[in-house]
Design a protein with these regions (language model features):
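Conserved small/polar residues in nucleotide/adenosyl-binding loops
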Residues: 242-244
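Basic, nucleic-acid-interacting segments
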Residues: 100-136, 141-158
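Short, conserved charged micro-motifs
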Residues: 214-224
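Long C-terminal interaction/binding lobes of large macromolecular proteins
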Residues: 202-207, 223-227, 239-240
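A common structural junction motif
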Residues: 229-236
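Aromatic/basic-lined ligand-recognition segments
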Residues: 138-207
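Hydrophobic, proline/glycine-rich low-complexity stretches
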Residues: 2-126
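Beta-strand elements of well-folded, non-transmembrane domains
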Residues: 56-63, 77-85, 132-136, 155-161, ...
Length: 244
């Protein structure tokens, strides 16, 4: 649209508190995603993932004892973009997800959302991640005292061009291990100087990624128990100090 140099002087420069968005006005808004893009310049290059990263909201999850837990969650939703398309309406990533915000979340819910992303954003592939910190009550190794342990978790879902869906759970398990450097220095002190030296411990993280079979389920509690059985030295949430 051509404008004269002084046309901006005629534009309203004040906020209009009485303006109402009507259905007709909403329909008149430009929609680049669903409009023809022949008039838009740019290289015909596909993009593997485009979307919104880390929008936050509280979601409901099943707790370790079957109770409902509301947990703050960071969500990332992306779709693929074909070479003949110039973009997507980013807000639809959030708006579609918000239609499921009252569901009890699990990797199974992701399949429904991913299909909505493909259909309503007209994409060949879609990906979804939900990252959250999951609380579980844990008993200390020696004292018998209990406290909450928080586990960083991520539910990930992927749908491909053939509508095949992959469900992946990422689970972080923090445990105590002997520092290898301190261990070697301690052994050196014993051998060379006949000196008693004790290596210190350190926090270590095991990141477990499990792809769930389409016909199977696994809970975060089961994953936690598998980690405890494999690594017996989880960091402790409650200690009883003994004064000598």
């Amino acid at each position: 649209m051509e404008t004269s140099p002084n046309s901006s002087d005629k534009l309203i420069r004040e906020y209009d508190p009485n303006f109402q968005v009507t259905p007709e006005y909403r329909d008149s808004l430009p929609d680049v995603q669903n409009s023809g893009c022949a008039e838009l310049d740019g290289a015909r290059v596909p993009i593997l993932q485009v979307g919104i990263s880390g929008f936050r909201l509280p979601l409901c999850y099943v707790g370790p004892d079957g109770e409902n837990l509301n947990i703050e969650t960071a969500v990332t939703g992306t779709v693929s973009l074909d070479a003949d398309k110039k973009g997507i309406n980013m807000s639809r990533i959030i708006r579609i997800f918000y239609e499921y915000k009252n569901e009890t979340f699990s990797p199974e819910i992701f399949a429904r959302i991913l299909r909505e992303y493909k259909d309503r954003l007209d994409s060949k592939e879609a990906r979804l991640k939900a990252q959250f910190s999951y609380p579980m009550m844990q008993e200390s190794l020696r004292s018998g005292l209990q406290g909450f342990q928080f586990y960083d978790c991520c539910f990930e879902g992927i749908i491909d061009r053939a509508d095949r869906i992959r469900k992946i759970i990422h689970f972080d398990f923090v445990y105590s291990s002997a520092c290898p450097c301190a261990s070697e220095l301690s052994e050196h002190a014993r051998e060379k100087r006949n000196l008693l030296a004790i290596p210190h411990s350190q926090r270590s993280k095991a990141r477990i990624s499990v792809e769930v079979h389409p016909d199977k389920e696994i809970s975060l509690l089961e994953l936690r128990d598998l980690c405890i059985n494999g690594l017996q030295t989880e960091t402790q949430v409650m200690l009883s100090l003994i004064h000598i």
